[in-house]
Each structure stands twice: as structure tokens, then as C-alpha cells.
């Protein structure tokens, strides 16, 4: 009896309730069996109906009695105590539903983040190795003379060499017109016309690309005094995004020891916009998303993506 009080359940009433459930099921089964058999053969139809109704009422009353008995016993059973220790079985209700657990999406996001981190770490490692920033502490301690500061030679390349590099790049891409201007002396400004899609103004310092402005093919690229406008943005959001992506590409294509390779790689990437409005997104397969074409081009594969689909 002490166990019964500790648990909070009347085990005797619980046993009687189980017997009452069995009795209720039996009485309900008798009702359906009686209905299945139908009226028994009697002398007259009237006598058969009276006997059928009488027996049917008796069966229903039996079901009602068993149901009332079960309800009475259910009030005597009681409820389990809330403070009763369930040990590890009490943690079963805390398990999440498998269908509602976003495990796959979280793992996929973590994989993308890890892949992107590894990619950028590789780029950073290659750039640091190119800069030759490693110095030995012993060399710095034993050397009494300071090393002479090395002046970057690539910033003062001959203009003829720069012109030859730009000319070779122009011959590589017949569908891309490159015009070279020198409005401020030695610094070059390139006017790149890509088919009938866009025009890009590339401001350079020797063979280093300083900035890029992309505008539509029919947009004005000159100021009032007929000079190239290297500051104003495009009036169209699509070309504004291409300008932003071009700035990102300048940060990606960095190779100080071979600036001609950087310019050629950037021009190859820029030429991939020749079908800006004709190439669908490689992720969603749509030509337009929120009214914009896929303005992003992958730096390695040159595949087209919408700005939101590339994430």
C-alpha cells in the first residue's frame, strides 16, 4: 500500500478498470453480433420485431452499465505523482522530432562555410608567400646593416610595354574593343566596349588596375568637357552591381610580380559579361530574379549566378 501511495495510482482500481474495459468490449461485441444475426424466425412478423427490440435494448443497457462502471473506476485510479523519479526514461519526451530538426540544412551551411574558409585561406597563403614577408630573427639580430629598401619596379614600367600588353589583350578578344587614353600623362585609362552590352572604364597606374566603372552600352561616358567620366555610377542597377563585382575581382586577381597576368585575367573575367542578358543562372536556372539578370561571374569557372544564388 505504501508503494501505491508513493506512485499516486490505486493499483487495485487500475486492475478493476482493466476488467471493466474487457467487459465493455464484450458487451459492445454482443450488440454488433446481435445486429448481424437479425430477427429470429417466429410465427408472426409482429412477434419477431418485439423480441428483436427487447433483446437489442437489453444489450444496449448492458453496454451502458459497463461504461458507467468504467467511468467510476477511472476516477478511483488516480494520477501518477509529478515528483516520481523516472530516471533516464523521463528524458524521452525531450527528444526532438526528426522531421522538425534542421540538421541537414545546418550541416550544409557548415560545409559551405568551411569550404569558403578553406578557399580564402589558400588565397591568403599564396599572397603572403608572394610578398616574401618571412624574416629570420637570427638574421635581424646578427646583421648590423639594414637592408636597402627595395623599390617596386612594376610601378614604373615603360609606357611602350604597357601599350604592348594592352594591344595583345585586345587581339585575344576580337569581340571586345579596348581603347587606351592617357589624359594625365603616363597613367592609362582604358575604355572597354563589350559587344553592345556594356562599356567599362578601367583606370590604371602603370599595369595595376586602380578602379573600374561599368555602364550600359547606350549610357553617356563623357563629362561636359568631353573627358571620360571615371566617377559617375551607372543609372541602371544591373550595371551598378557589375561595377561592385568588378571591384571584388580586382581584389581577387592579385599577383604583384606578374601584373600583365593580372590584367589579362581581369579582362577575361570581364569578357564573360558578353551574354549578360542571355545566360541563365547556374543555380536557379532563371534569367531574371527581382528584375535583375545574373550579374555575378565566378572567378574561376566564369559561370553566371544571381547575387543571392551565389551564397
Curated annotation (Swiss-Prot):
Component of the Mediator complex. Belongs to the Mediator complex subunit 27 family. GO terms for cellular component: mediator complex. Its main location: nucleus. This is Mediator of RNA polymerase II transcription subunit 27. One of its GO terms (molecular function) is transcription coactivator activity. It comes from Danio rerio (Zebrafish). One of its GO terms (biological process) is regulation of transcription by RNA polymerase II. Component of the Mediator complex, a coactivator involved in the regulated transcription of nearly all RNA polymerase II-dependent genes. Mediator functions as a bridge to convey information from gene-specific regulatory proteins to the basal RNA polymerase II transcription machinery. Mediator is recruited to promoters by direct interactions with regulatory proteins and serves as a scaffold for the assembly of a functional preinitiation complex with RNA polymerase II and the general transcription factors. Required for the development of dopaminergic amacrine cells in the retina. Keywords: Activator, Developmental protein, Nucleus, Transcription, Transcription regulation. Transmembrane segments: none annotated. It is found in: Nucleus.
Amino acid at each position: 500500500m505504501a508503494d501505491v501511495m508513493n506512485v499516486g495510482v490505486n493499483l487495485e482500481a487500475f486492475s478493476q478498470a482493466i476488467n471493466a474495459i474487457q467487459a465493455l468490449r464484450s458487451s459492445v461485441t454482443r450488440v454488433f453480433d446481435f445486429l448481424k444475426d437479425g430477427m429470429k424466425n417466429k410465427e408472426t412478423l409482429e412477434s419477431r420485431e418485439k423480441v428483436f427490440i427487447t433483446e437489442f435494448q437489453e444489450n444496449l443497457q448492458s453496454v451502458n452499465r459497463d461504461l458507467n462502471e468504467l467511468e467510476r473506476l477511472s476516477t478511483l485510479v488516480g494520477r501518477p505523482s509529478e515528483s516520481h523519479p523516472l530516471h533516464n526514461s523521463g528524458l524521452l519526451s525531450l527528444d526532438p522530432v526528426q522531421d522538425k530538426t534542421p540538421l541537414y540544412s545546418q550541416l550544409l551551411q557548415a560545409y559551405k562555410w568551411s569550404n569558403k574558409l578553406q578557399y580564402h585561406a589558400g588565397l591568403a597563403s599564396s599572397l603572403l608567400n608572394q610578398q616574401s614577408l618571412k624574416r629570420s630573427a637570427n638574421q635581424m639580430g646578427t646583421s648590423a646593416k639594414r637592408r636597402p629598401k627595395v623599390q617596386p619596379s612594376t610601378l614604373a614600367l615603360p609606357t611602350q610595354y604597357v601599350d604592348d600588353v594592352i594591344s595583345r589583350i585586345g587581339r585575344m578578344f576580337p569581340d571586345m574593343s579596348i581603347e587606351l587614353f592617357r589624359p594625365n600623362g603616363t597613367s592609362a585609362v582604358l575604355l572597354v566596349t563589350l559587344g553592345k552590352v556594356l562599356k567599362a572604364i578601367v583606370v590604371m597606374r602603370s599595369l595595376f588596375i586602380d578602379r573600374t566603372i561599368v555602364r550600359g552600352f547606350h549610357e553617356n561616358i563623357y563629362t561636359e568637357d568631353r573627358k571620360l567620366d571615371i566617377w559617375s555610377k551607372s543609372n541602371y542597377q544591373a550595371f551598378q552591381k557589375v561595377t561592385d563585382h568588378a571591384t571584388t575581382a580586382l581584389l581577387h586577381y592579385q599577383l604583384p610580380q606578374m601584373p600583365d597576368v593580372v590584367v589579362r585575367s581581369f579582362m577575361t573575367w570581364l569578357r564573360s559579361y558578353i551574354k549578360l542578358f542571355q545566360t541563365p543562372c547556374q543555380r536557379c536556372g532563371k534569367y531574371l530574379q527581382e528584375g535583375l539578370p545574373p550579374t555575378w561571374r565566378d572567378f574561376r569557372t566564369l559561370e553566371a549566378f544571381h547575387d543571392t544564388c551565389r551564397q
